C-alpha cells in the first residue's frame, strides 16, 4: 500500500528545491539517511545532509554533513577501526571520509576514479551503501559517459580495508534499454540509490529516465569478480 503523504520534505533555504536521492544505512537500531539537499541558487547548490530514524517514518534532522557542492553519499554499515565511514562524490570520482561522531569528517580520499574513453568517463557516484558479502563489499555505482547516458556498474571493495577497490567489472551491469528508461524527464538514465538482498537474491531498485521506478535482480552467487 502506498502512503498518500511524503515521509520527508524539504525545509529551509538549502532544501528549497528539494530533497533527493536518499541512501539508507542501518547501524545498530538506527537508520541513517544521507540525501541531497538542493537549494536551487545554482545548479551546483547541492549539499549532503543527514537524518536518522528508528521506524523510517519519524525523522530527526542532523543538517549538512559536508558544506560543499557534493552528493551521492552513504554510510558503511560497519565501523572501520572504530570510525564511521562515509562515501561521497567530489566530481568526478567516488571518495570516502571518516568520523568519530558523524559530525566532523576527515581523511578524505579517492576510492575509485573515472575511466577515460568509455561508459564511465564523465563521472561516477555511489548507487547505495556497499553490501557485505563473503568476497568483500559489493559496491554498485552509476557512471555517465560523454553522451550523458547513465548506467550502473559494480565493484568489489576490500572487506578489511574498504578504501581499496579489489576489482571493478569492465562492463555495466545495467543500462537504459527499455522505452521508459530511454524516454522521460531525463532520457537514457538508470539511477539507483538502494538495493535489497532477500533469499540470496539481489534486488536493485532504480529510476528510469528520472520518471518511473524499476527493479532488476540477480542471484548473489552469480556475481563473480
Please report, for each region that a protein language model flagged, where it lies by residue.
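Beta-rich carbohydrate-recognition and catalytic domains
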Residues: 1-17, 25-122, 131-188, 199-202, ...
Amino acid at each position: 500500500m502506498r502512503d498518500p503523504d511524503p515521509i520527508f520534505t524539504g525545509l529551509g533555504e538549502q532544501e528549497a528545491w528539494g530533497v533527493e536521492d536518499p541512501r539508507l544505512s542501518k547501524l545498530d537500531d538506527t537508520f541513517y539517511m544521507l540525501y541531497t539537499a538542493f537549494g536551487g541558487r545554482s545548479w551546483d547548490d547541492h549539499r549532503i545532509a543527514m537524518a536518522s530514524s528508528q521506524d523510517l517514518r519519524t525523522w530527526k534532522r542532523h543538517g549538512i554533513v559536508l558544506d560543499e557542492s557534493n552528493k551521492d553519499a552513504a554510510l558503511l554499515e560497519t565501523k572501520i577501526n572504530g570510525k564511521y565511514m562515509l562515501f561521497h562524490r567530489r566530481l568526478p570520482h567516488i571518495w570516502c571520509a571518516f568520523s568519530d561522531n558523524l559530525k566532523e569528517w576527515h581523511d578524505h580520499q579517492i576510492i575509485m576514479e573515472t575511466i577515460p574513453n568509455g561508459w564511465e568517463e564523465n563521472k561516477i557516484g555511489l548507487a547505495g551503501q556497499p553490501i557485505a558479502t563473503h568476497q568483500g563489499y559489493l559496491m554498485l555505482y552509476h557512471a555517465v559517459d560523454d553522451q550523458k547516458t547513465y548506467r550502473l556498474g559494480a565493484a568489489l571493495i576490500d572487506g578489511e580495508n574498504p578504501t581499496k577497490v579489489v576489482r571493478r567489472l569492465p562492463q555495466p551491469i545495467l543500462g537504459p534499454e527499455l522505452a521508459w528508461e530511454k524516454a522521460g524527464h531525463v532520457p537514457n538514465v538508470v539511477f539507483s540509490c538502494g538495493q535489497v538482498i532477500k533469499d540470496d537474491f539481489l534486488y536493485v531498485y532504480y529510476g528510469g529516465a528520472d520518471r518511473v521506478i524499476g527493479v532488476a535482480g540477480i542471484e548473489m552467487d552469480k556475481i563473480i569478480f
